[in-house]
């Protein structure tokens, strides 16, 4: 599982009318391993790592919908899971982002993953950390070589990400001025 390409859209685009990041993701052999096949152990480990995912409604538009989608029938593919993880990582860092969309993109196993971001560097880092988290939760035999460095720790990586995001966040006064300008359509 690897990112083939990344695009950052700062304004209206084919994907949304607000800033989004697009990842072209190659699942490789993991195309044969949707979440239903990975099983409850994988899903439960993800739920423990990011409990806020329980609030994601996904296509059901109700809390718990995303985990329901992961467990139903075959489940869903890891590109779709990465979309939700990148959004949730930004949420735990204090950003109120919700939009995401994942679609198959040509060759089998290649997906276009699009998700909203509030701050460019934070959004990019959320996608990269999300990919590492998903890889770390895979059974050893399915884990892509080199995807998870020796000694990598999810709690430590999560905390570093939150600190990274907080250092880049606008202060309260500046943030309120920016929001007011956006609400009035002032660039």
Describe every region a protein language model picked out:
Residues 1-187:
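Preference for protein termini
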């Amino acid at each position: 599982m690897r990112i083939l390409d990344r695009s950052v859209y700062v304004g209206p685009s084919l994907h949304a009318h607000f800033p989004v990041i697009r990842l072209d993701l190659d699942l490789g052999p993991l195309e044969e391993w949707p979440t239903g096949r990975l099983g409850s152990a994988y899903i439960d480990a993800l739920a423990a790592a990011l409990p806020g995912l329980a609030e994601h409604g996904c296509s059901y538009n109700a809390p718990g919908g995303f985990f329901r989608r992961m467990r139903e029938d075959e489940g869903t593919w890891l590109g779709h899971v990465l979309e939700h993880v990148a959004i949730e990582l930004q949420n735990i860092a204090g950003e109120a982002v919700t939009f995401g969309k994942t679609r198959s993109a040509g060759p089998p196993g290649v997906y276009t993953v699009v998700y909203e971001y509030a701050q460019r560097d934070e959004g990019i880092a959320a996608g990269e950390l999300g990919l590492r988290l998903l890889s770390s939760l895979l059974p050893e035999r399915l884990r892509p070589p080199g995807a998870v460095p020796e000694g990598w720790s999810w709690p430590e990586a999560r905390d570093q990400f939150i600190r990274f995001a907080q250092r880049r966040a606008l202060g309260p006064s500046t943030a309120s001025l920016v929001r007011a300008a956006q609400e009035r359509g002032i660039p």
